[in-house]
From Swiss-Prot:
Listed GO CC annotations: cytosolic large ribosomal subunit
InterPro entries tied to this protein: L3_arc_euk, Ribosomal_L3_dom_3_arc_sf, Ribosomal_uL3, Ribosomal_uL3_arc, Ribosomal_uL3_CS, Transl_B-barrel_sf
Name of the molecule in the record: Large ribosomal subunit protein uL3
Organism of provenance: Natronomonas pharaonis (strain ATCC 35678 / DSM 2160 / CIP 103997 / JCM 8858 / NBRC 14720 / NCIMB 2260 / Gabara)
Subunit annotation: Part of the 50S ribosomal subunit. Forms a cluster with proteins L14 and L24e.
Lineage: Archaea, Methanobacteriati, Methanobacteriota, Stenosarchaea group, Halobacteria
Record keywords: Ribonucleoprotein, Ribosomal protein, RNA-binding, rRNA-binding
Listed GO biological process terms: translation
GO MF annotation, one: rRNA binding
Length: 336
């Protein structure tokens, strides 16, 4: 059998593999929600991994109704704050911000991240409702931020600011929900947005590995035999043909590895709670989880202490039952 061709591993769809512009991941699309108006996103800080014993509730599964061990990632999810409402309009170049309304009372640490508007001139809230009546309003989003200063395990006070879409109901209902949320102080929790058992999409910035060669970066084979004895075992054989006289972007070369934004689809929320979930001695490189948390089935991108964002799944498959039965959460220490 001939040797199959494998010039590299990995999708070219992720190229160029450069460092992420920000540690706060972004969502470029949002699901269409036909339920009640509400926020379509939340964020937390990755603490580490553990495992739980839960009842398999997947319909038509051979193990339905039986106990099984599930690996989970623990994400600490302290309450977030909504500080502004941003309205969008349709233009020939896509959606563009129309105007935004800021709350008068913001958290004291928010000025570490951005310059907070001191005062706003005119009736901006009235402008949003006027645009709604005229049919010029296309979408409503809320500017939210985390409060990492309230966590003992995240060594920073600078909030992470992000934009979250308001979904569900009519456009008028979404405007009312967003304005009421900001007027009421803007504080909201993960249980206000999600429910245990839902499928979510998780976005994060992966662990950075610096500059790496083509073997680690692209998974190419090391040279063998006489080619390796030339002195370069971990280099590629050539950069391409004489013509066209340029190096193509498909050639696997050394470069930045890791610290990329990645979004993983259909991650199930196993549990949302605030009970003791920390292992004996705390999570390695993180510490104790003192407040609300989310247990996500499987792994999520990024190292410990890094921000991860959630949104409702944009491509949900067959949704299992909500509120899965968790019988045991491991708090055993792996450090002895």
């Amino acid at each position: 059998m001939p040797q199959p061709s494998r010039p590299r591993k990995g999708s070219m769809g992720f190229s160029p593999r450069s460092r992420a512009a920000s540690e706060v991941p972004r969502f470029n699309s949002w699901p269409d929600d036909e339920g009640q108006p509400g926020l379509q996103g939340f964020a937390g800080y990755k603490a580490g991994m553990s495992h739980v014993v839960a009842i398999n509730d997947e319909p038509n599964s051979p193990r339905e109704g039986q106990e099984e061990t599930v690996p989970v990632t623990v994400v600490e999810t302290p309450p977030m704050r909504a500080v502004a409402v941003r309205a969008y309009e349709d233009t020939p170049y896509g959606k563009r911000p129309l105007t935004e309304v800021w709350t008068d009372e913001v958290h004291e640490d928010l000025e570490r991240s951005l310059s907070v508007p001191e005062e706003q001139s005119g009736d901006i809230e009235g402008d949003i409702r006027t645009a709604l009546d005229e049919g010029a309003l296309a979408d409503v989003r809320v500017i939210t931020h985390t409060v990492p200063g309230a966590l003992s395990s995240v060594p920073k006070k600078e909030p992470d600011v992000m934009e979250t879409r308001v979904g569900g109901g009519s456009l008028s209902d979404r405007v009312d929900f967003a304005l009421d949320l900001v007027d009421d102080g803007g504080e909201h929790t993960v249980t206000d947005v999600f429910r245990a058992g839902e499928y979510t999409d998780v976005a994060g910035i992966t662990k950075g590995k610096g500059t790496q060669g083509p073997v680690k970066r692209w998974g190419v084979q090391k040279r063998k035999g006489k080619h390796a004895r030339q002195g370069w075992r971990r280099r590629i054989g050539n950069l391409g043909p004489w013509n066209p006289s340029r190096v193509r972007s498909t050639v696997p070369q050394q470069g930045q590895t890791g610290y990329h934004q990645r979004t993983e689809l259909n991650k199930r929320l196993i549990d949302l709670g605030d009970d003791d979930v920390s292992p004996d001695g705390g999570f390695v490189n993180y510490g104790e989880v003192d407040g609300p948390y989310a247990l996500v089935k499987g792994s999520v991108p990024g190292p410990d202490k890094r921000l991860v964002r959630f949104r409702p799944a944009v491509r949900p498959g067959d949704q299992p039952r909500l509120d899965p039965e968790v019988r045991y959460v491991s708090t055993a220490s792996n450090q002895g």
